[in-house]
Amino acid sequence: MIKLRKNIANMAGYVPGYQPEDPAAYIKLNTNENSYPPSPKVIEAIIAEVGEGLKRYPDAASRAAREAAAELYGFPPEWVIMANGSDEVLNNLIRAFADEGDEIAFVYPSYSYYATLAEVQGARVKTFGLTEDWKLKDFPKIYEGRIFFLTNPNAPLGFTFSQTYIEELAGRVSGTLVIDETYADFAEVTSLELVRKYDNVVVTRTFSKSYSLAGMRLGLAVARPEVISALDKIRDHYNLDRLAQAAAVAALHDQEYLRETVGKIQETRQWFCDQLGKLGYTVIPSHGNYVFATPPDRNGERIYQGLFDRKILVRHFSDPNLAHGLRISIGTQAEMEKTIVALVEIG
């Protein structure tokens, strides 16, 4: 008889957004992917890497990608680690800093995968709710848990914490403060400077959203060298393949394309929010590539099903505190115009 660890046997596991077998048949606005293609320079770099060199292992340290990220963000390379998606960094941070039975915490609502990763490690989970002015409810003067995850901008709601408040939290977290900046490029805000000021701050980033590389699995973290060294010890030794490393370098070097793509999404986001308002939806002002919108009748499931029937995928959460609304990714202008037409039809 197979005997699993008790925490693994008892956990539910993370449930990602629906991935259709034929994504081209849908307007896909449910997993916050970027509807625009990657930079042409990224495609060129990947194609150039395909060849005889694939028979050799990749650079285990991903040095070229680390150096490109370090140069972009203004840090020495030893302050940066590359990852097979930012989820790998999040996982390894818990492995590095939390023993079985230790407490990790995060904001509710935010990325539910934090809880899954904690359960795998056997850590205890605590959540902190939000006040109306987007601060943490009942957060202690000093939080003594091992890790506190702060998603900024918040997902699924889209608001941002002020940098002043985040710095205040850095001084109130006795363990490690992980600032998950998955959507920061769309907000044009960052807490990277806090890494220089506080030795317990880690900032994570992904290439899945603003760089249009969700299918490549690329992420990174910026932290003090002693933290990066610890993460280096426990990561998979060849965690980024040759194609991913080439893509990362090319993407980081083409900031002009990133700004162009992000700019389009920001413009469409504002247009879409305005249109939702005209339809009577309540929309939380968003700084991500998505919005959280509540229909007038507060029946998010009804709207979700109506859109699904029209081959438009959005995210509806069964959580009773979120079920009234929908998280809708911002696609191209044409995709969002079709979505508005569908919402008018659904009523």
UniProtKB/Swiss-Prot annotation:
Keywords: Amino-acid biosynthesis, Aminotransferase, Histidine biosynthesis, Pyridoxal phosphate, Transferase. Gene3D superfamilies: Aspartate Aminotransferase, domain 1 (3.90.1150.10), Type I PLP-dependent aspartate aminotransferase-like (Major domain) (3.40.640.10). Its EC number is 2.6.1.9. One of its GO terms (biological process) is L-histidine biosynthetic process. Its cofactor is pyridoxal 5'-phosphate. The modification N6-(pyridoxal phosphate)lysine is found at residue 209. Pathway: Amino-acid biosynthesis; L-histidine biosynthesis; L-histidine from 5-phospho-alpha-D-ribose 1-diphosphate: step 7/9. GO terms for molecular function: histidinol-phosphate transaminase activity; pyridoxal phosphate binding. It catalyses: L-histidinol phosphate + 2-oxoglutarate = 3-(imidazol-4-yl)-2-oxopropyl phosphate + L-glutamate. Belongs to the class-II pyridoxal-phosphate-dependent aminotransferase family. Histidinol-phosphate aminotransferase subfamily. Homodimer. HAMAP family: HisC_aminotrans_2. This is Histidinol-phosphate aminotransferase. It comes from Geotalea daltonii (strain DSM 22248 / JCM 15807 / FRC-32).
